[in-house]
Each structure stands twice: as C-alpha cells, then as structure tokens.
Amino acid sequence: YVATVFTTHATVTGRCVAGNGLPLYKDLGRLNAGELARQFNVVAKHSIEKIASQEHDVFCTVSEITARECESLLGSTVDVVTPNGFEDDFVWNGREFDEKRAEARRAMIRTAEATLSCKFDGEPLIVGTSGRYEFRNKGIDIFLDALKQLAETDALDREVLVYITVPSATTGPRKDLQAHLADENSPIDPKQNRFCTHYLEHPEWDQILNSIAGSVLANPSSKVKVVFVPTYLNGRDGIFDKSYYELLVGMDMTLFPSYYEPWGYTPLESTAFSVPTLTTTLAGFGLWAGSQGEHEGVTLVARNDDNYAEAAREIAKALLHFTKYTPQEVEIARNAAAELSRTALWSELYAAYEKAYSEAIERSVTRTNRAVLNDGGGTTEQINFVRQQLITEKPHWNRVMVEKVLPKRLHALEVLSHNLWWSWTSGARDLFEYIDQKLWSECEKNPIVFLDRLPLERLQELEQDGSFLAMLDGVYAMFNEYMSEKPDPKAPTIAYFSMEYGLHSSLKI
C-alpha cells in the first residue's frame, strides 16, 4: 500500500478572491467556494484541490493562516502545518560575501544613475521587493503608496534607492541603457520610460509604472528613486547579468507587505543574506516570525481587510526609521536577520514533515482494510479481507461508442485535426473557421471536437463547395510537404514542460 500526503501551498479560490480586490479574511467563514470558483472560471482546479484535500491520509499546509483558508474553502481540516524550510548552502561566507555585497551595490547604484539620469549625493539606502507580479496579493500596491508617503516626509534626509524586481512581459533589455553602461558617453534615449530597465510589451497598462506616473515618485528631485526590473534575474537579463541572489546581497532592507502570502520564501531568503526585511501578519512567514518573539531582523506590520491606509503609514514609518539607523544599529539588525534564518533551516523544521509521514503510514494501514495475524512468535502474516459481494437484480449498462466517418473527399480534415501543425499554420486555421466560425469558437478551437459536432448537412455542402475544396487541397499539400521532411538526427531534441501553459488551448494540461 501507499500512504498519501497532500500539501497545499495556497487555494486557487482564495488567491482569486484576494487578487481581484475582494475581502478574503473577514468573510472567510461565509464564502461559497464553489460559487466563487464558477465566477472566476477555476472550477476544475478548485475541484481537484477539494477532492485531494479529502482523499488523503494526511492533509498539510504551510501556515496557520492557510490552514484556516483550507478549512473554509476546501471543507477539510488540516492535520499538520508544515512550514517551509530551506538550506543555506547558497549563501556566501566571509570575504566572498563582502565582495559580492560591494559588487552588487556598485551595480545597482550605477544602473539606477543611468536609468534615472541622476547622481546620488552619497551612499543611498537600497531597498527592494520581488516575487510574482500580483499587484495586490504581493503588496506591491501598498508598497508604492508607502514610498509616496516616505518621499513626502520632511524628516527624510537620506536618499532611498528602491528596486522592484518583478517579472513581467518584456521584449528584452533597453538598448540605450546597455550602450550607456558599456560606454558612459553613449546617451540615454529620453523617449524610453526612465523607471524601467527593459522594454515592456504593454507599458501603458503596467500597474507599477502607472502608480509611479504623476506621483511624487516621478519627481526627479524626490529623495526616493524607484527602478523597475521587469524580468527574471537569472544572470542573463542583459542589464545586470547577475542572479537574484547576487543583487539581493547588496540591499539594505527588503519589503514584502503581502495581502495574500501562504508562506513567503522571499523574506526568508532575505534574512539568509543578512538583509533585514518587512512582512505582514497576512503572510505565513510573517506569522511564523512573529511567533519567534520581538526581532530586530524582521519588521511585522499588521494587515487586515480594513486597515490599508494605516498599514501603508506603518510601512513608511518603518522605512523612515531604518534610514536613521547608525552603522551599529544596522549591524545588529543584519546579524539578527541571519540568526532568525537559521531557525528556518530544514534541520529545524523537518520534524513537522516526519510527523505528517508517520501519521499517513498509520492511517493508510487502517484504510487498506488489512489485518496482521501474529502467532505469538517471530512470524507474522498479513491477510487481505475479502468482503462478500451482494448480487442484486439490476439492469446492465453497456457503453456504445459512435464514431464519425467523414466523406472521403474531406478525409484530409481528419488528418489535419490530429496534428498540431494546424495550430501554427494560418491557412489550416482558416479552413476550420470557414466551415462554421460560430461552432469553431464554441468548441474552443479544438478541431477534433469541432469535426465531431459538424452536422451531416454541412459536410455534404462542403463536398460541393469548390472554393473550400481548393483551399483544403492547398493546405493538405503544405502539410504533406512538411511531413515529408526527414528530421536531422544531429539536430537538438526539444522537450516542452510547463505547469501553466500548453502548446495550444485545445491541448489541456
């Protein structure tokens, strides 16, 4: 037998509610998860989560706040809370750490001065945030509002450099910025958005840039400077060419004021690099850090459904307070952050998983309806129970499969529908749209389903449609030419893996 453990790191319905600006927490006990799943078109995902949470030996999640969410939205009580741990073997030590930090600071200051066309008077306080581009869930909205309040504070007497490293839809690094970083005599293009390091596909709709535009953060004389890096920092971004960790190590403080955050690896990673961080009481990590007592390395801001303005003020206040730190106070906060991170190592947190696995094994024995007979000696025997099957008089249902048969003249349609070649060939797509555009849309552009639903009368019409047949013959000839090409045995083999996107919408994942 196999013991089963289901661990969820969020609920799809909860994430949808939070991400769409609806209150999640104060109405949690009254939310109708099934109806919400239908509204947000996530019925399948919600159903899988709900069934998985019920058909388990042990049900786990990563934080107490998500445990309450699961109980309300999935209807299942969490058996064991299993906080996320990590290994610190990716963190540099000693001299290498200091060199990496100094190098990161130089790179971030130099890039900001080039992007913003400014010059820092002294050493700025470098703060940052990162993660998925979920404007409300990740607290990017409240972070920007707090920065605006900070920028308008007369008590701010130090420049603050803010990096928002959140991947978005980009078309590559800015060429003018690349050229200027390679040669300072190369000019910066004034037509480009000066807050962004990369070209965005739709900058006019970007929530971060729109929040900055027209605010005090857009004022060149503001002491708070914001740079948006909308790409993955994987060492090949074209501007920094450094990994996320290679920039994180150079920051003075990070902020992750999330509204929806079942755990939150980003603030934990921050503490691992001795960077003090700010999080909230709506984040799993924030609640866990708060349970460790008062801590100089982590600032915890209270958030709920009704205190947005108050929380924004607290975040601005925490930032202002940090700008006033003496070098000794900064060192204390950095050491405290590193110390806290060591309590989140897997060696400290794995016990919760061991508990979950042990309970799962015990429950699976009961679930399998097996008994162990012991003869009192050293021999045991496992017996499978076989229950008596009651036979009742009832009708037997047999499944009958009815397969369509296309007219011979239209057989090419059948062939085309079973090869994804049609999905990237406009002529092939036009064929199916020509037949019945409305039905094509109703079938979600799935040619196999589409042909199954075509009425016989329409097929007979197509057999006599000269224009359509000429189009079909042309496309089919292109397809046969494509299929006749012999693959190059020396060509690279490509495999496609994605948890979110299929090759085509008709190919479900």
Where are these regions (language model features)?
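Catalytic cores of nucleotide-sugar-dependent glycosyltransferases that transfer UDP/GDP/TDP-activated
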Residues: 1-509
